[in-house]
Amino acid sequence: MELNRRQFTGSLGMLMLSTISGNIFSCSTKEANSKVDSISLYMVNVTKSRNFSHSTWHNRQHVFIKIQAGRHAGWAEALANKNDLDFDIAKWGSYLNELNGMPIAKAIEHCRSKFLQKKWNAKMTEPALIALYDIVGKIENKPTIELWELNKREPVPGLFCILEKNVDQALVQAQIAKDQNLTSHVKIKMFGDVEIDLALTVALRQFFGEDSFLMADANRGYKKWERLDELALRMKDLQKAGLNAMEDPAELTTEQWIELQNKVGDFSLIPDRPMRPAHKALDLFNQDMGHYFNIHPDTMGTFKEAVKLGKKIKAADRGLMIGDSSLIGPACTFWQQLAIGLGASWVEAIEKPQESNVFQECVTNMSTKIANGKTEISALRPGFGIEMDEVKLKALADKYVKLY
């Protein structure tokens, strides 16, 4: 029997789901019987602007998500939107209505299937899965990273990110990094403009000194080149100015990544875009593309594959970066625990009290903390360890919606 394109895509997604499902990412009988009872959304507006080579975010809308299953609550966070202070979170979150009444095991399978069949994107799937896996650990009374057999526990350096075009404004952010003792690893957003990028590099290297690992992310912003030698020369100029590494300098094929890394030698390239989503990156990963590889929140889609990808990067003797999606709240500790459990080189997904303190005001328990410039396990709690003061959160949030 012939399948039309839609039927084939659906069948392929279900085949992938059945192929890559695994015991440690599944539910025991105990939690399989627990059901999704309610979902609540809390919107937090962040008005600190963020500058990229592709656009400027003047404000952004974060949604803290609580999924309730019996007496257990799972917490997550989504960067839901940008530049709309009146964003409709009920409309945005309506896709979560599909989970109403589902057993936890079925809800996890549903989210994975939706992503693998390309019906949900990673920004929809990941927050739902994080909250559901949080519930799994809480029902089992075990940390979820233990259920996932992620056994490393060494603290991981936190990466402070500076997103400013203006050197003086960048130096203001650099002082915040210094005040927070987050200077061992610093990331600069770059813009594909040699003059601006060199000025930022020189100023920040001078500010932080020689001991800081200074990396940059151009978001594929270097476009004015015809031969890789030209792009390599720009990377080497940045290295001479004090830069250690560059994430996604330009739109590159796998072969171009490999050739460029060979041309720039001890200057480290960090592929990010080629690592998205995790289930595809498992096949596309080539260790010769860079010295470090980024697992970026909101782009992996599914976490069994993200963990496999992280282990594959480490097994190839390459550095592992856990990135960020401008997160400010409950998602940060999840990514920090993933970074610690995998033995990452650094983690960018750290709390940002200088941009919003709502999370810090409302969280009552969590498993990680930032100390001496590193994220470390403070006390491993069931699930991902998040507990929130919901009365205070409801009061501080810009919007609150209970979907059901």
State where each predicted segment sits.
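Metal-dependent enolase-superfamily TIM-barrel catalytic cores that perform enediolate-based chemistry
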Residues: E146-V264
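Structured beta-strand/loop patches that form or line metal/cofactor-binding pockets in enzymes
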Residues: E31-D84, N357-E361
